[in-house]
Amino acid sequence: MGAKHVSRDAARSQSGLDGVPTFLASAAGARTRLRTLPAVRDARVEIVLPGAARITLVEREAVGRWVASDNVEWFIDAAGVLFPSIDRTGAPGLRVYDERAPRSAGERIDPPALVEAALRLAALAPGELRADATDLRVVMTAGANGLVLRTGARWEVRFGSAERFDEKLSLARRFLRDNPTRRLDYVDVRSPDRIVFSPN
């Protein structure tokens, strides 16, 4: 069956083929039903005589974890699709916390560039930006600050959208490198043409 995120029983049940006589079974219908499972990107179904079916699933590849505002942790793929998994170790430990409305399985976080940017921030090592940038937490805020990197030292970097993310990250790195001990509440790089920080 080739399943990591979907149990054999769930796939068998979703296919709708259990107990269906071979001459009435529809491989196309079973494939369509299987593709409604959020963790399934595609499926191949073969009806085999005298009375069996062979199901092969192509599952989504988890690139990280997306924690919704209701504390449900979803796996997320590079296209931004959220899905559950029977394998809790089946995704990298990179986490993004979403403070916006709760999410559901199969929902897509748009644009994919936002997912990529958030996971790049989640991959930063403690102390990589500056010595007190530890206990990092990547957050999608509900307000205008958008994508935010919060630190255990109680200061944050505000990135906003994923537009021009590389420039924003470079600007934040440069500012933090040049100000390794400055007391901060926030560094705002939402506009890469101008940096705002507090206290200034």
What residue spans do the PLM features occupy?
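Short extracytoplasmic
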Residues: M1-T32, T36
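Charged, solvent-exposed interaction patches on well-folded alpha/beta domains
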Residues: A10-T22, D42-N200
